Amino acid sequence: MAAAPVFFPSSVVVSVYRAHGYAFSCSSLLSQLPAIKLSSYRPTRTDHTAITLLPNSNRIASRLQAMQSPTFEVNGDGKTEEVEKLQKGIAEFYDESSGIWEEIWGDHMHHGFYDPGTTVSLADHRTAQIRMIEEALRFASVSDDPMKKPKRIVDVGCGIGGSSRYFARKYDAECKGITLSPVQAKRAQALAVAEGLQGTVSFEVADALAQPFPHGQFDLVWSMESGEHMPDKEKFVRELVRVAAPGATIIIVTWCHRDLSPSEHSLKPQEQKLLNKICDSYYLPAWCSTADYVKILESLFLEDIKRADWSEYVAPFWPAVIRSALTWKGFTSLIRSGWKTIKGAMVMPLMIEGFKKDVIKFSVITCRKPE
């Protein structure tokens, strides 16, 4: 009789079976790995991976079980209560704050890319946000050649659709954007119609961890500053890879914490305390490092993996956001917007502190899905 499969979280399976070591310490299990047979990946409601245990491997099963994260109630859609609460907070935060952002900063809801040490005006900041898009495309070697340029693009965590509309014009491409915020999706679509792009750009409310698209649909998968909101980084990356067509480029621009040294198992307590304060106001789950992202990509056999720290190139951004909040227009808009936006404004100095102390890194990670 065939052994019954036992289900464990995918992150545990990858950590133990491939011995990458991120998030778990599993060196003591390496000598016993031959007793574990990894079955083909079969996603379930809770995104667990099946392991078929061979004879005399109960002890391994119990040790794997002990390595799991605390369990939570799983709802009918496969989400834990904790994830549902987080995503509800994210949606409400952006429902509340997107209007004030657009009014002051325009339709690109992300950092700008600046030459180090420069002094810039608000108009320069908007130019810098476009430059951020172009620099990320250049870093990933996305071609402008009419025969090679992307034709189908997904914007994961699209905000009010600034990147999507930019791509539609730049590449004459079909773009789809997803966001947790109904207010953002509605505004993004309205702007697309106003710009005559309704035939090529569309937006919807959807979960980046369970994207509403078939496998292999897009030849450019774009995530600009949305990864930091993802409670399961491995599942997030798996979804980016799943919807990518063979040969597609994947671009992740995101906030990370610094890489840990070989002797470290976690951030220092004062560093973690700083990040926790930011998480509370911006509805962020636990942070990861750029190295963590790279390990996930390597485990999925992605090609041409590249990474860079662009922290010095975004340094003028947060001081500029604070200055805009202290203008009369910014202050009155902030008060009208609501408590979640006010809380976010109050921790902006902590973002500056995190960058200055090298705890926070502004990271770009790119790769290509094999043909």
From Swiss-Prot:
It is an enzyme of class 2 (transferase). Coiled coil: none annotated. Pathway: Alkaloid biosynthesis; vindoline biosynthesis. GO terms for biological process: alkaloid metabolic process; methylation. Residues 243-252 are annotated as: SAM motif III. It is found in: Plastid, Chloroplast inner membrane. InterPro entries: Methyltransf_11, MTs_g-TMT, SAM-dependent_MTases_sf. Keywords: Alkaloid metabolism, Chloroplast, Membrane, Methyltransferase, Plastid, Plastid inner membrane, S-adenosyl-L-methionine, Transferase, Transit peptide. Its main location: plastid. Gene3D superfamilies: Vaccinia Virus protein VP39 (3.40.50.150). Residues 216-224 are annotated as: SAM motif II. It comes from the Eukaryota. One of its GO terms (molecular function) is S-adenosylmethionine-dependent methyltransferase activity. SUPFAM superfamilies: S-adenosyl-L-methionine-dependent methyltransferases. The keyword Signal does not apply. Residues 1-65 form a transit peptide. Its EC number is 2.1.1.-. It holds the Pfam family Methyltransf_11. Belongs to the class I-like SAM-binding methyltransferase superfamily. gTMT family. S-adenosyl-L-methionine-dependent N-methyltransferase involved in the biosynthesis of biologically active monoterpenoid indole alkaloids (MIAs) natural products including vindoline. Inactive with picrinine as substrate. Homodimer. PANTHER family: MAGNESIUM PROTOPORPHYRIN IX METHYLTRANSFERASE, CHLOROPLASTIC-RELATED (PTHR43591:SF81), METHYLTRANSFERASE (PTHR43591). This is Gamma-tocopherol methyltransferase, chloroplastic. The lineage of its organism: Eukaryota, Viridiplantae, Streptophyta, Embryophyta, Tracheophyta. The gene is TMT3.
